[in-house]
Amino acid sequence: MEHVTMAVTSSSPGPAPLSLLSNNDDFIAPFNINTKFPSAIVPPRTSSNQPISVAIPSNRISSAGLAATQQAQTRKRKASVAQISLPSMLPTSFSPYTMAPQPPQPPPNPDRFATEDFFSPSRRTWSEEKEKVLTGPYDYLNGHPGKDIRSQMVKAFDAWLDVPSESLEVITKVISMLHTASLLVDDVEDNSVLRRGFPVAHSIFGIPQTINTSNYVYFYALQELQKLKNPKAVSIFSEELLNLHRGQGMDLFWRDTLTCPTEDDYLEMVSNKTGGLFRLGIKLMQAESRSPVDCVPLVNIIGLIFQIADDYHNLWNREYTANKGMCEDLTEGKFSFPVIHSIRSNPSNMQLLNILKQKTGDEEVKRYAVAYMESTGSFEYTRKVIKVLVDRARQMTEDIDDGRGKSGGIHKILDRIMLHQEENVAQKNGKKE
C-alpha cells in the first residue's frame, strides 16, 4: 500500500468555481479522489493548509501515475475554461420574456412612488409580443379554420339587406371573433379533446389562459363594433351575448345534474345558444341597412336547423368522428336532440340515461348507445324534423324574396345541410353515392 500526499488549499468561503457547477464534459472539476477511486480512504481534513494523506492500493495507481493524471486534467480544465465563456452556456436566443443576464442594478428607491406618473401614455409598454401572448389560443384555433358558415350567411342575407361594405366588413369580423371565442370556452366546458381534427386550445395553452383569451376577444369584438357608430349596435351585442350565455348555462345545467329536458326546453335553449350569434349578425346588418326586410324569423329557424343537424352528425357522421372524436356528445353526457327523444320515448328504460351519467369514452358502449337510439327511432325522427324545418325555411326565404331573385345564397346553405344528411344516411347504409 503506497501513500500519496496531496496539498489541498482553501480560500475564503464563496461560490463554487464555474468548473464545479457545469455538467458539460468540457468542464473538468478539480481532481476528486473519492470519485476517481471510490475505495480510497480519505481522512477528515483538520486544516485547510495541511497535507492530506490518502491511502491508495499500490496495484491501482502509482504516485507518478497520479501526478501525471492530475497534470493532464488541470491542463484540460484550463483550456476548456479559456475557450468557453459564460454566454455560451445560455440559450442562443431569447423570447421577450426569457430572463437574460442583467448588469447589476442599483437598489430600487421607494421614494419614486411618491411622485412618478406610472400611467402616462409614454410609459405604457403594451406591445405586439404581449398581444400575441394574450391571443395565443384564439390565433391557434383560427389557424385551423372551419367551414365559415357564418360569413356565408352574412353574404346570403346581404343580397336583401345591401349593407354598406365598410359596415359589412366590421360585422363579419365581429361575428367571426365571437364565434371563435365561444368555441374556446365550449371546448373547456365540454371537456373536448379535438376541435376540427386538432387538439383543443386549452390542451396546449391551459384552461386559465384559454378562458382569459376568450373573454378578452369578447370585449375586443365589442370595441371593434363601435366602429359602426350605430347606437343600436351595443344594445344588440349585449342582448344576444346574454342570450348565448343563458342557453349555454341551461345546457350545462342539464348535463351536470343529469336532467333530461323537454323538447320545448331544448328548443328554447338552442334559440338562445346557437341562434344568438346568428341573430346578432342579422340584427346588426338590419341596423346598418336601409331595407325594411325583417330576416330575424328566418334566421331563428336556420339556427334550430344547424344545432339539430349538429347533434345528429355528432352521433352519426364519420367526418365528425374524425374531427371531434366518436360520439363526443355521449362522452360529454350531453342531452342532444336525438338523446332527448330516445330517453322520452321509453322513460322506463334507464340504460341511455346511465350511459350519459358515466361520460364514457368506451367506443363499444357508445356503439351500443347509438344502436339503442336507432331502435327507438330517434335518428329517423331527427332526420324528419330537419327536413320539415328546412322546408319551412325555404318557404320563408321565398316569402322574403318576393320574386326578386335574391334568395340563391340561402337556398345553397339549406341544400348543403340536406345533402350532408343524405350522404351520412348512405354511408350508414353502406350505399355508394
Swiss-Prot record:
Binding note for cofactor: Binds 2 Mg(2+) ions per subunit.
Induction statement: By blue light.
Catalysis: reaction(s): isopentenyl diphosphate + dimethylallyl diphosphate = (2E)-geranyl diphosphate + diphosphate; isopentenyl diphosphate + (2E)-geranyl diphosphate = (2E,6E)-farnesyl diphosphate + diphosphate; isopentenyl diphosphate + (2E,6E)-farnesyl diphosphate = (2E,6E,10E)-geranylgeranyl diphosphate + diphosphate
Enzyme class: transferase
Listed PROSITE patterns: POLYPRENYL_SYNTHASE_1, POLYPRENYL_SYNTHASE_2
UniProt-recorded Gene Ontology molecular function terms: (2E,6E)-farnesyl diphosphate synthase activity; dimethylallyltranstransferase activity; geranylgeranyl diphosphate synthase activity; metal ion binding
Xref: InterPro entries: Isoprenoid_synthase_dom_sf, Polyprenyl_synt, Polyprenyl_synt_CS
Keywords carried by this UniProt record: Carotenoid biosynthesis, Cytoplasm, Isoprene biosynthesis, Magnesium, Metal-binding, Transferase
A Gene Ontology cellular-component term: cytoplasm
Function as written in the Swiss-Prot or TrEMBL entry: Catalyzes the trans-addition of the three molecules of IPP onto DMAPP to form geranylgeranyl pyrophosphate.
Protein name: Geranylgeranyl pyrophosphate synthase
Source organism of the structure: Neurospora crassa (strain ATCC 24698 / 74-OR23-1A / CBS 708.71 / DSM 1257 / FGSC 987)
Gene that this sequence comes from: al-3
